[in-house]
Amino acid sequence: MSQSKKIFTRMCLNNWGGINHKVLQFNEYVNLFSGKSGSGKSTVMDAIQVILYGSFSPTFLNKAADDAKNRRSVLSYLRGEQKDGSANRGDCDFCSVIALEIEDTGSHTFTCIGIAFEVRKNDSEIKRFVYFSHSGRMPEPSYVTADGFCYSNNDIKKFVNTRSQSADRHARSEE
C-alpha cells in the first residue's frame, strides 16, 4: 500500500508574465521544465513560489533569471513586462489569478490555493490582492468569467463562498 501524499495536479496562470491564460498539467512523479532562455521556465517557478510562500518581495524571486537591467518583481510579472521594456498589460487596469490544484492521493480529494490580484495602470505597488483556498478542482474555465475576463477579487470571494457552502465546507479567502 502506497503512502498518501499531496501532489500538484494543475496550475492556472491568468495574466502572469507573458501568459494571458494557461493551465499547466503536472505529472505525479516527474515534471521537466525545459526551453530556451526567455521561454517562461522561471516565470512558472516564481508563480509557484509566490503561491506557496505568499511573499511579494523581489529578493524572493529567481535571481538567477534576472539580468542587470531587468529586476523581476511580482508587479512586473503581473504587468507582463518584457526585456525590451514593453509590457503586455502596462497601460490598462486588469485582474490576475495564479493558483495550484493539489490532490491528496489517499482520499483523492482536491484543494486549490492561490492569489487573485487587481492592478490599476498607475499602481506602483501591489495594493489589491486576495489569498484564497477552496475544495474541489479548479473551475472551468479556470478562474475566467463567461465573458472571458479573469476573475476579479470579488469574483474569487463569491466563488470561494459558493464552494464553502458545498458538502465539505472547505474554502477561505483573505486580504
Regions found by a protein language model. Name each.
Residues M1-C150, N154-K157, T162-Q165:
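Extreme N-terminal "head/tail" segments of very large remodeling/mechanoenzyme assemblies
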Residues E174-E175:
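Conserved small/polar residues in nucleotide/adenosyl-binding loops
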